[in-house]
Amino acid sequence: MDTPKVLTRDEAIKIVREYKKIISPRFNGKAKVLMYGSYSKGNANPWSDSDVAVVVPKIDEDKWLETSVALGNDSDKVSLLIEPVLMSEEHWSPLYDDVMQTGIMV
């Protein structure tokens, strides 16, 4: 079995930009899209995925699951490597802090 090719950071960002174009209308352009994880930190390997945070100002809890599933379906239209995570600015988490500190705004 051949080892998969490691994307460059620029190649990963290009893929995430395509994804952002697809999802932006869902949030009326108000979502921040950040690439975080191995590609943003510069330590991606052949099995790395593109961790993508979709940060919205606010989302109703009853819409959270539905929106997360839709984001996953949208990511499959661009690349199976994209792993989206929905986040809200009003609900703090340690992951949110990490994304904001190390993520690359796309």
Feature-to-residue mapping (PLM):
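Catalytic core of pol beta-like nucleotidyltransferases
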Residues: M1-K32, K41-W47, P57-V106
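Short beta-strand->loop micro-motif that forms the acidic, two-metal-ion catalytic signature
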Residues: V52-V54
